[in-house]
Swiss-Prot record:
Protein name per its UniProtKB record: Ferritin light chain
GO molecular-function terms, A-Z: ferric iron binding; ferrous iron binding; ferroxidase activity
Reported induction: Up-regulated by iron-supplemented diet in the anterior part of the gut of third instar larvae and adults (at protein level).
UniProt signal peptide: 1-19
Homology family: Belongs to the ferritin family.
Residue span(s) of domain Ferritin-like diiron: 48-208
Keywords: Disulfide bond, Golgi apparatus, Iron, Iron storage, Metal-binding, Secreted, Signal
A Pfam family this chain is assigned to: Ferritin
Main localization of the protein described in the UniProt heading: Golgi
Amino acid sequence: MKFFVALALFACLGSLALAKDDEYCQNTVITACSTSAFSANSICNARFAGIDHIEPEIQSYINANLAKSYDYLLLATHFNSYQKNRPGFQKLYQGLSDRSFEDSIALIKQVTRRGGIVDFNTRHESSGSVSTKRGTLEVDELHSLALALDTEKQLATGATHVHSRATHATDAERDPELAHYFEENFLGKQAESVRKLSGYANDLAKLMKVPDPSLSVYLFDEYLQKQ
């Protein structure tokens, strides 16, 4: 009788040990490495904390930055034409385009560093999603600043949303590393961009309150070239 009790206890402990094996890389690494490549569901990866919860939000934000980068590039091209000939505005929007593109590359590196895979066909809608709808970009100088300001506010709101999800989620979904990354690389920078563009828009609006604002716009463009 004692033999059967001991055998049952041994079998129970063995099943518990096997159940725990799937939770740690050290218990499955030999099996995983015996194949040609780690499977997508392997525990031997760089994913930890709340990356599963936040990855779709970051993916959406990457797509938004890429879309806005091309919008800014179109604005820069518009003001670089011989008809408009506004090199100051061209410089401003070219800089914003380059920054958004570089932010996309940095985010792609961050996602892959954390064990994620970037899929540009993924569409994730949330309260922090940035609109990628493209409106009319052939606008005058003042309206272009208003358009850029709206875009920067959208990007800032999107970054704030990702940071909030990484910070205020449940214990299993919280990700302090990603929250710190967004705080260090996006929130302060985008707050400064919103402040700068809002100042530009207000200054130019005041300068244009004259019967013929062409000289005011020309001087403002000269100012932008020096920034």
